[in-house]
């Protein structure tokens, strides 16, 4: 048996048993992650890097031996040709995909701008309508106040009526 040494190891702190919590939705999952991070705020949180977009190997700038698709019997050159051809097709497919993606992005941006312009036009039209209604209500209130004023006086002043007609003419313009 092994000999016991006089130095004893310090007792390890036991972690509190955590109940198993299964997140039911995204907010629960986010809350659990935040709670775990906040248990030890001194520990730095790791933010994963965004994965790099895949791109094919670049084509060689200079190819010394250009071989054809036909090869003699027992020749290993055909395999080299086949790999080069596959890589070139892959590169062309990637470039086609990138151009398609750019085209779709441009169309999307144009559509966003067009929708924004249409929305602004509709908003301006509705704003004008609201302003007209406001002015109409003000005119109705003014007209009622003037009628009440005339009723209280019992008679109409030719000077006041001329002034009110001048004001209404100015407002119509």
UniProtKB/Swiss-Prot annotation:
<dbReference type="InterPro" id="IPR009548">
    <property type="entry name" value="Prkrip1"/>
</dbReference>
<feature type="compositionally biased region" description="Basic and acidic residues">
    <location>
        <begin position="144"/>
        <end position="173"/>
    </location>
</feature>
<dbReference type="Pfam" id="PF06658">
    <property type="entry name" value="DUF1168"/>
</dbReference>
<comment type="function">
    <text>Required for pre-mRNA splicing as component of the spliceosome. Binds double-stranded RNA.</text>
</comment>
<dbReference type="GO" id="GO:0019901">
    <property type="term" value="F:protein kinase binding"/>
</dbReference>
<protein>
    <recommendedName>
        <fullName>PRKR-interacting protein 1 homolog</fullName>
    </recommendedName>
</protein>
<comment type="similarity">
    <text>Belongs to the PRKRIP1 family.</text>
</comment>
<dbReference type="GO" id="GO:0008380">
    <property type="term" value="P:RNA splicing"/>
</dbReference>
<feature type="coiled-coil region">
    <location>
        <begin position="99"/>
        <end position="150"/>
    </location>
</feature>
<feature type="region of interest" description="Required for RNA-binding">
    <location>
        <begin position="50"/>
        <end position="142"/>
    </location>
</feature>
<feature type="region of interest" description="Disordered">
    <location>
        <begin position="117"/>
        <end position="173"/>
    </location>
</feature>
<keyword id="KW-0747">Spliceosome</keyword>
<feature type="region of interest" description="Disordered">
    <location>
        <begin position="1"/>
        <end position="59"/>
    </location>
</feature>
<feature type="region of interest" description="Required for nuclear localization">
    <location>
        <begin position="125"/>
        <end position="137"/>
    </location>
</feature>
<keyword id="KW-0539">Nucleus</keyword>
<dbReference type="GO" id="GO:0004860">
    <property type="term" value="F:protein kinase inhibitor activity"/>
</dbReference>
<dbReference type="GO" id="GO:0003725">
    <property type="term" value="F:double-stranded RNA binding"/>
</dbReference>
<feature type="compositionally biased region" description="Basic and acidic residues">
    <location>
        <begin position="26"/>
        <end position="42"/>
    </location>
</feature>
<keyword id="KW-0508">mRNA splicing</keyword>
<comment type="subunit">
    <text>Component of the pre-catalytic and post-catalytic spliceosome complexes.</text>
</comment>
<keyword id="KW-0175">Coiled coil</keyword>
<keyword id="KW-0507">mRNA processing</keyword>
<dbReference type="GO" id="GO:0006397">
    <property type="term" value="P:mRNA processing"/>
</dbReference>
<dbReference type="GO" id="GO:0005730">
    <property type="term" value="C:nucleolus"/>
</dbReference>
<feature type="compositionally biased region" description="Basic residues">
    <location>
        <begin position="124"/>
        <end position="143"/>
    </location>
</feature>
<dbReference type="GO" id="GO:0005681">
    <property type="term" value="C:spliceosomal complex"/>
</dbReference>
């Amino acid at each position: 048996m092994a000999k016991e040494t006089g130095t004893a190891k310090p007792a390890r702190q036991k972690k509190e048993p955590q109940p198993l919590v299964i997140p039911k939705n995204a907010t629960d999952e986010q809350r659990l992650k935040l709670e775990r991070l906040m248990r030890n705020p001194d520990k730095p949180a790791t933010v994963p890097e965004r994965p790099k977009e895949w791109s094919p190997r670049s084509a060689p700038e200079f190819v010394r031996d250009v071989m054809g698709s036909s090869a003699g019997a027992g020749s290993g050159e055909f395999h080299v040709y086949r790999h080069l051809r596959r890589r070139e097709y892959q590169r062309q497919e990637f470039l086609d995909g990138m151009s398609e993606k750019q085209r779709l992005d441009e169309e999307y941006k144009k559509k966003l701008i067009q929708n924004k312009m249409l929305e602004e036009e509709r908003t301006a039209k509705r704003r004008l309508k609201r302003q007209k209604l406001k002015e109409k209500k003000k005119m109705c209130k003014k007209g009622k106040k003037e009628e009440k004023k005339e009723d209280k006086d019992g008679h109409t002043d030719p000077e006041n009526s001329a002034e009110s007609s001048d004001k209404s003419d100015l407002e119509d313009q």
